[in-house]
């Protein structure tokens, strides 16, 4: 069943990449741990722990969830007639919205044990919606975002673990676009197939 407002908490143990397409809902994404990259236009923006981003309906985007990333997400249906922010970007949580997200997480964990939490859950989401309506999303390229946007295979000033994820993401992208696996391994991993397979299991949790 599709609800007008839905809260989800998700943990990504391995690298996950969403297809680049226009989204069908408004979404508030808050990073608890790990790292998320959001692609808007030709730029990518790093969302670090403690940061949140707003993604409006019909926004063309792709999200990259790095391994060991925990996010909270609230989706708002386009059926809602409220005037949600139309621009994507970082948002500053209010004290109330932060407290609500924390309480939603706690309530979600108990929801399966008690039926009387459902109405309280809906009430909190309704209050959170009012907070969201006042958000003013801004796009600004942080130092980390800039390093990701400048990154290329031959030159990286990112931490080693981030570089590894970017190389593996590039490998997957090339193979999805039709490049032969052996050619990708030759180009990105100096022909070391065993090393490539080990890294696939480490980063993706499966072979490519």
Label the model's feature ranges.
Residues 1-35:
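Generic protein-terminus/edge-of-domain signal
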Residues 27, 33-39, 52-53, 61:
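Short beta-strand segments in beta-sandwich/barrel cores
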Residues 32-33, 48-49, 67:
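A cytosolic small-molecule/anion-sensing beta-strand core signal
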Residues 41-57:
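Short acidic-glycine-tyrosine-enriched beta hairpin
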Residues 59-90:
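Ligand-binding loop in jelly-roll beta-barrel domains
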Residues 93-153:
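An amphipathic alpha-helical interaction segment
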Residues 148-154, 172-208:
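Basic/polar phosphate-binding segments, predominantly the helix-turn-helix DNA-binding elements
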Residues 151-167:
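Short, Lys/Arg-enriched anionic-surface-contact patches
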């Amino acid at each position: 069943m599709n609800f007008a407002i839905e809260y989800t908490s998700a943990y990504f143990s391995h690298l996950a990449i969403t297809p680049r397409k226009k989204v069908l809902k408004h979404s508030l994404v808050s990073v608890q741990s790990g790292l998320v990259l959001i692609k808007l236009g030709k730029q990518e923006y790093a969302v670090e722990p403690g940061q949140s981003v707003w993604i409006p309906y019909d926004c063309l985007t792709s999200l990259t969830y790095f391994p060991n990333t925990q996010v909270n997400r609230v989706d708002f249906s386009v059926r809602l007639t409220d005037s949600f922010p139309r621009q994507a970007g970082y948002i500053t949580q209010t004290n109330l919205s932060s407290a609500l997200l924390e309480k939603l997480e706690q309530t979600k964990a108990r929801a399966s044990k008690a039926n009387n939490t459902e109405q309280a859950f809906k009430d909190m989401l309704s209050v959170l919606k009012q907070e969201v309506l006042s958000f003013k999303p801004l796009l600004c390229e942080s130092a980390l975002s800039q390093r990701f946007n400048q990154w290329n295979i031959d030159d990286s000033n990112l931490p080693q673990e981030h570089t590894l994820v970017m190389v593996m993401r590039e490998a997957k992208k090339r193979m999805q676009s039709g490049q032969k696996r052996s050619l990708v391994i030759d180009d990105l991993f100096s022909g070391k197939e065993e090393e490539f397979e080990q890294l696939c299991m480490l980063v993706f949790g499966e072979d490519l």
